């Protein structure tokens, strides 16, 4: 009979292993032997979902009480997923969270689901003064402004999603994290946070998603982060967007309309100086970026802005991924003109119902000297604007090394592929360009 080498491991190592098992599997190990009976109660972390337990809540309540009674040491991880409208447990969740925070939790993850606003649980105030928290994720819960100065000296990662904020708490949380490196804020409902200021000397990664359905002019965002390297900015609501000190920015994923709605015609008129200046200052503030992903709604804003103002230069930009419809192709040469050192270009192409006349006479500097790799996705065989787009790069890109084309009506017949290849090879300016059709 083989030796039970697992049971020979020290308790500390076994506890660490049990922490990565599902809670039910961890509990089952208690029947292995008397030594294993209470090992699961001493794991340094717990990942529990109320939905994995009987609906009456008795077993879950008993498990939590026993775990916290036996395990009085410092916890590494505590992840809790629950419904705050479970009336039989509604008074227990917040005290449990407060207890693990008091015991020196390092990684706290709390998600409340299916919670109408009147059942929202406001998190315990001691979260805002934890000396041990390294990462904090809160989803669909409330945050109240504490009566003390927020201080989270070890917090590096913070994720706040669909939070019901009291005034100033978001700004106080961010300013109270002197080593914060990674911040995510997601807002999909109305709250009291009309102004969001992100000021941090240490922040490296920032993601903002704001997609609440009702338009308003009352929302503002201000970002001041001199060490920021990556920003994902997906905001369809904020009217005023201010960025400062982003000279370290390497990559941006941009999807914003500056709260401009074009469905009933463009509200961006020459006399709208305030909105024009907001857009200009934002673009100037991110102009040192090297890698950009930009959405179709944002390009539409820039297209309309380009008719009343000058787009700033992006001298450092070498990689661009953009969503261009055939109606926006008129902007493409002008947009490439502000990227004089562009090396890689990915275009997600789509066909508009009423494409504008395309004028490809302008020859941007990057086509002559730097652009080496172009990929165009979602082309359609025999669609005129798409063919013009492909020929524009082939006929004018002097140093192009590779052009990759993918079609939504693939696979093409051999005859179609041969016809397309003949068209492409006969118009190449760069003799070393390799054309790949997917």
From Swiss-Prot:
Entry superkingdom: Eukaryota
Q: Which PROSITE patterns match?
A: FBOX
Gene3D superfamilies under this entry? 1.20.1280.50, Ribonuclease Inhibitor
LRR repeats sit at 246-275, 286-310
Instruction: Outline the extent of the FBD domain.
Output: 355-407
* Domain F-box, residue spans: 3-49
Q: Which residues form a coiled coil?
A: none
Keyword field contains Lipid metabolism: no
Q: Alphabetically list the UniProt keywords.
A: Leucine-rich repeat, Repeat
What InterPro entries is this protein classified in?
F-box-like_dom_sf (IPR036047), F-box_AtFBL13-like (IPR053781), F-box_dom (IPR001810), FBD (IPR006566), FBL13/AtMIF1-like (IPR050232), LRR_dom_sf (IPR032675), LRR_FXL15/At3g58940/PEG3-like (IPR055411)
PANTHER family in alphabetical order: F-BOX/RNI SUPERFAMILY PROTEIN-RELATED, PROTEIN WITH RNI-LIKE_FBD-LIKE DOMAIN
Question: Under which name does UniProt file this protein?
Answer: Putative F-box/FBD/LRR-repeat protein At5g44950
Which species is this UniProt entry from? Arabidopsis thaliana
């Amino acid at each position: 009979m083989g030796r039970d080498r697992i049971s020979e491991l020290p308790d500390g190592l076994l506890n660490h292993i049990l922490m990565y098992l599902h809670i039910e599997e961890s509990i089952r190990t208690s029947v292995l032997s008397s030594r294993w009976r209470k090992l699961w109660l001493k794991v340094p972390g717990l990942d529990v979902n109320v939905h994995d337990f009987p609906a009456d809540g008795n077993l879950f309540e008993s498990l939590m009480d026993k775990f916290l009674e036996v395990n009085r040491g410092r916890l590494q991880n505590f992840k809790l997923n629950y419904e705050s409208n479970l009336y039989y447990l509604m008074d227990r969740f917040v005290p449990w969270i407060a207890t693990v925070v008091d015991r020196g939790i390092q990684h706290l993850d709390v998600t409340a689901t299916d919670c109408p606003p009147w059942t929202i649980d406001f998190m315990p105030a001691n979260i805002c003064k934890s000396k041990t928290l390294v990462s904090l994720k809160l989803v669909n819960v409330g945050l109240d402004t504490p009566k003390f100065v927020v201080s989270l000296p070890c917090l590096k990662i913070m994720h706040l999603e669909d939070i019901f904020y009291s005034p100033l708490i978001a700004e106080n949380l961010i300013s109270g994290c002197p080593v914060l490196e990674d911040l995510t804020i997601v807002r999909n409902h109305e709250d009291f946070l009309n102004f969001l200021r992100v000021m941090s000397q240490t922040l490296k990664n920032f993601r903002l998603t704001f997609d609440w359905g009702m338009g308003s002019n009352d929302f503002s965002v201000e970002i001041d982060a001199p060490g920021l390297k990556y920003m994902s900015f997906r905001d369809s609501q904020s009217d005023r967007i201010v960025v400062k000190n982003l000279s370290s920015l390497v990559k941006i994923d941009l999807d914003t309309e500056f709260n401009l709605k074009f469905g009933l015609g463009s509200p961006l008129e020459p006399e709208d100086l305030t909105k024009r200046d907001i857009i200009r200052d934002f673009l100037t503030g991110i102009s040192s970026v090297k890698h950009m992903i930009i959405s179709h709604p944002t390009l539409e804003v820039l297209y309309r802005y380009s008719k009343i103002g000058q787009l700033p230069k992006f001298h450092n930009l070498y990689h661009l991924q953009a969503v261009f419809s055939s109606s926006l192709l008129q902007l493409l040469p002008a947009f490439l003109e502000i990227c004089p050192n562009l090396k890689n270009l990915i275009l997600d192409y789509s066909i508009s119902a009423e494409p504008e006349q395309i004028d490809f006479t302008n020859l941007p500097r990057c086509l002559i000297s730097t652009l080496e790799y172009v990929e165009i996705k979602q082309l359609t065989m025999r669609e005129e604007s798409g063919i013009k787009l492909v020929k524009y790069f082939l006929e004018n890109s002097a140093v192009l090394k590779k052009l990759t084309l993918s079609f939504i009506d693939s696979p093409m017949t051999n005859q179609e592929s041969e016809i397309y290849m003949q068209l492409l090879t006969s118009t190449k300016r760069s003799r070393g360009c390799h054309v790949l059709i997917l």
